Amino acid sequence: MPQKLYRSLDANLAFLEERFGRSDDFYTKRLMIAGIPCAVVMFTGLSSPEKLCRMALDMLDRDPAMLGGGEGLCVYLLTQSRIPAEPDAVEDTTALVELLTNGLSILLIDGVRKAVAFSTQEMPQRSISAPTGEGNLRGSQEAFTELLRNNISLLRRQFRTGTLTAEIYTAHTRAKTEYCLCYDSALAPKETIDALRARLEQVEIPVLLDSAYFASFLKQDKLNLFPAAAYTERPATACARLCEGKAIVLVAGCPYALVVPSFFAEHFECLDDYASSAVFAGLIRILKYLAFLLAVFGPGLYVMAVAFAPEIIPVRLLTKLAQGEVSTPLPPMLEMLSVTLLLEIVREAGLRAPQSISHTVSLVGALIIGETAVSAGIVSVPVLTMAAAATIATLAVPSLYEQSILFRFAVILLAGCFGVPGLACAALTILAMACGSEPFGYDYLYPLLPPGRASLRDGFVRSIWSRLAKSGEVIGRHEA
C-alpha cells in the first residue's frame, strides 16, 4: 500500500532528505507563493531549475488569481492555470519518487497532502545520427536514440495516423525502467497485442538495459534458436513493420526497437529492396539466401566431401584439395573447426577492442595469422578459403549472425563425425526448428512455405510496387 504524502511540508522534505539526502544532485528550494510555504524538489541532472522558474513561477507571479490557501493553489495549478503542469496530482510517496527519478520537478505545498509535477526534463542526450548497423543507399538516415520519448516522436513523425497507439509501462526491475508498446490499432490483431502485452507485464528481471532482454520471454520454445522478434535501429523500418500490423517495443536507454512478431524471410529484406527495381531487389534477395546457406552448410559440406565422399568432387579439384590436405597434421573436421574458431576470436577481438586499434586487430588476425598458419602447414589453403567465405557470407545476413555461427559448428561436427547422414540430420533438424517456430501463433516461414503467390510477391523475390500495393499485406490476413 503506497504511503500518502504528509500534510506538513517539513515532513515531506524530511522524507525526501532521508531518501535522497546523500545525493549531491538532489535539489531543494523553499519559497513562498502568494504567502503559502512551498518547496521545489528535483534532480539537477535530469531537470532544469531555470526552466521551471521561467515556465511556472514567473508566470504564477504575474497571475492575479485568488488562490485561497494551499488547496486552492493546488487546484489552480492543476485545473485553471496556464502553467503546463501534469494533469494529475501526486498523492503518494511512491509516485513522488518515480516522477523525480524520471526527471520531473515537484512542487510541495504546506498543508496539502498533494503535490504538483512539472515536465521540466533536461536530460543529457545524444543527437539523432545515421544508423551504424543497418546500411542503406536510399531512404531515411535517422536512427533511434537512447531517450524513449524521442524515439516515440520519431515514429509519430513518419507514421502520421490517429490509430498509432503508444502505451508506456514501467518494467518490474529495480531500476523501474520504462518501455513502450507501439502498434497501429486499426491493423494489429487485438489478440496478438493482448498476448504481447501480457507477456511483457509478466517479465521480472533485475535490470532492463536493452530491448533484447525481452526476446527470450517472447519465445514459446526456449530451445528453438530462431528468434521470435527482430531488431531495428531505423524508425523507417519500424514504421514499415507497423504498416504490416506488427508491434514495436521501445525501451528507455536502448537505441534499438524490438519488432514482434518476426518471420524468417524478413531477415533477408532491407529498405533498399523497395527503393530499387523489382528485378534487382529479387536478385539481391536470392543472393542473401544463398549466402545464408553457404554460411551454415559450406564448411560442413566441405568436411563431409573431403573425408567421406571424395567421389562427388571433380578430379582436378580433388587433386588440389589432396595436395593441400597432405601437408597438414589435422583431419579436415578439426582443421575446419580450428580455423572457424580462430576467425570468430579475431572478429570478437576486433569488435570489443578500442575503436582506435580494432581495425589493426582485424587485419593482423585475418592476414598475418592466416598466412602464418598456411605457411607453417597447420591448415590448408582450401580450408582457410572455405572458412573465410562462410564468415563473409554470414555478414550478408547480420540479423541471423548468432544462428549462422551456432548452426555452422553443429553442421561441421555432425558432417565430420557421421558424413552424409550427419549432414542430412543437421539440415533436417534446422528445417524442423524453423517449421516448428510459431511466434504468437503465426507461421515463421511465411511467406516462403507453403509455396504460393505470396512467395513470389514478397518472399524469395519482390514483385513490382503496383502488385504490392494491391496486396495490402498484414499479419493475420495471410492468403491461403
Indicate where each model-derived feature is located:
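Hydrophobic alpha-helical transmembrane segments of membrane transport and translocation systems
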Residues: 381-383, 388-480
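Membrane-embedded alpha-helical signal segments
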Residues: 1-297, 315, 435-480
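Functionally constrained cores in energy, signaling, and assembly domains
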Residues: 84, 105, 137, 166, ...
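Transmembrane alpha-helical segments that form the functional core of multipass membrane systems
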Residues: 249, 256, 262-411
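Short glycine/serine/threonine-biased micro-segments
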Residues: 137, 160, 368, 375, ...
